[in-house]
Amino acid sequence: MECHNQQSSQPPTTTHCSGGETNCYEKRWHDHRGTIIERGCGCPTVKPGVKLNCCTTDKCNN
């Protein structure tokens, strides 16, 4: 699985996930800096108020 891993509005970068991971994720939340976007491998548990999108194809989380 290959997932995007850049933060917020940085230029796109990708990583090859280890351990047979089959999901990519995108988390979004707001703070004093504005909208923060985090991308990576897996499908993490998030706190209330954080939007989470998990997907199962290469580079699906951009």
UniProtKB/Swiss-Prot annotation:
Compartment(s): Secreted
Region (Disordered): 1-20
CDD domains per UniProt: TFP_snake_toxin
Keywords: Acetylcholine receptor inhibiting toxin, Disulfide bond, Ion channel impairing toxin, Neurotoxin, Postsynaptic neurotoxin, Secreted, Toxin
PROSITE patterns: SNAKE_TOXIN (PS00272)
Molecular function via GO: acetylcholine receptor inhibitor activity; ion channel regulator activity; toxin activity
Function text: Binds to muscle nicotinic acetylcholine receptor (nAChR) and inhibit acetylcholine from binding to the receptor, thereby impairing neuromuscular transmission.
Family membership: Belongs to the three-finger toxin family. Short-chain subfamily. Type I alpha-neurotoxin sub-subfamily.
Protein name: Short neurotoxin 1
